[in-house]
C-alpha cells in the first residue's frame, strides 16, 4: 500500500511539474498555434471558394441570357436577334481581352497608381495554387471577368437598333481596356483612389460596383445616346414584355451573386448583401407599379420589372 501511495505521489509531482513548465514556456510553444489556425483557414478558404464559384456563375447568368432577354424584349421584333448577338459577342470578346490584358491592367502591381501594367498579362504568375486573399487567384480572375463582361453589355441599351455590329465590338473592346480596367485599378486594385491613395486613408468605398460598374457604364451610355440623338420610334411599345420579365428575373437572381459575391467570403456580410438586394428589388418594383398606377391609371409588367 505504501509503495502504491509513493507511486501516486511521484506521478502527481510529475504532472504538476509538467504543468508548471508548460505555463512557463507556453509563449515559446508557438508551433501549436499555427497548426490550429491553418485548419481554420483551410475550412474558410473552402467555404469562400465554393461560394465565389457559385457567384461567378450567377453574374455570368446575368448577361447570358438575362440581359439579352431583358433588352431583347424591349426592342422591335426584327432586332431581337441583333441584341442577342451583341450581348453574346461582348461576353466572348471581353472574356478573351480580360484574360489577355484587362486583368493585368486592373489588378496588376503597377507602381503609378493609374494602371496595373502588363505583369499579369495572359495570367502570368497565376496558377491553381496562388491565392488572392482567401480565394484562388484564378477564381478571383474569373469572378472579376464576369464584371468586365456585364459592364459593357449594360451599354447595349443606349445604342441598340442604331449601330453596326463591328462598332459594338470595337467600342466595347477599347472601352473595357482604356476606361473600365483602369478605373477598376484606381478603386479596387490599389490605385490612386483606393486606401492610401490621393484621398489618404479614406479612399473610395465601392462595395459592389456602384462606381466601377454602374456609373462608368451609365456615363458611357449617356454620351453615346447624346451623340446618336433621339430614337425615331421611341414611342413604340416593347414587342415582348414576357422576355423583359424573364430577363429581369434572371438579373434579380444574378444580383445575389453580384452583390453577395463582392464580399469575397461566405459570411454574414454576403448574407446581408443578398437580403438587402432582395428587399430593395421588391420594394422598387412595388414603388414603380404604384407610380404607374397613380400617373397612368394602371400598372404594367414592363414598368414593374423596370423598377
List each language-model region with its residue ranges:
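Hydrophobic alpha-helical transmembrane bundles of multi-pass membrane proteins
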Residues: 39-306
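Short, Lys/Arg-enriched N-terminal segments with co-localized hydrophobic residues
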Residues: 8-12, 17-43
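Zn2+-dependent metallopeptidase catalytic domains
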Residues: 5
